[in-house]
A protein has these predicted regions:
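Short, positively charged patches
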Residues: 1-140
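Phosphate/pyrophosphate-binding betaalpha-module
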Residues: 135-159
């Protein structure tokens, strides 16, 4: 759980893009090492510029602790890139997410067909109904339904 806090810290850190975070993970063995690295050491990697090194100097773990508490309260799990359950197919894309959030059981993504349902946050009642029905019918047939879990179409598809 302690190591997870540093993954969430890194993923939630504003102003530092995901590609930079991924390059840093190539140089350091863990987000915890990135957390404790001084700005000078971060700069030596060539992965960050001075502004990004300054942003990475924000050592507040409050946001990470809040995310972990909210996930625990909601019964959600977090999968990091170094977790064995992180999908290999996802790890191989150009810009993979550092973390995956989920609820329920963690499916084996590499063995199942997956369908993503994404849409607008500002949707019509008809759109909500269609997304909800679509997500339900797909899941009923055994499909793995994925979404970004944003309010609107994404959330409706996951009900």
């Amino acid at each position: 759980m302690a190591a997870l806090k540093y993954w969430v810290w890194l993923a939630a850190l504003p102003g530092v893009g995901s590609r930079v975070k991924l390059r840093l993970l190539e140089h350091f063995s863990s987000p915890e090492e990135i957390y404790y690295a001084p700005p000078e050491e971060l700069l030596l990697t060539g992965a960050v510029d001075k502004l990004q090194a300054k942003l990475l100097a924000d050592k507040s773990l409050t946001r990470a602790e809040d995310v972990l508490a909210a996930c625990a309260k909601a019964g959600q799990f977090i999968v990091t890139m170094d977790d064995t359950t992180y999908p290999a197919r996802l790890r191989d894309i150009f810009d993979p997410p550092l973390l995956l959030y989920g609820k329920g059981s963690m499916p084996i993504f590499d063995d199942e067909a997956a369908i993503a349902v994404v849409g607008t946050r500002k949707c019509t009642a008809y759109g909500l109904d269609v997304a909800s029905q679509l997500g339900y019918e797909l899941a009923k047939q055994g499909a793995l339904v994925l979404s970004g879990m944003a309010k609107g179409i994404d959330t409706a598809a996951m009900k």
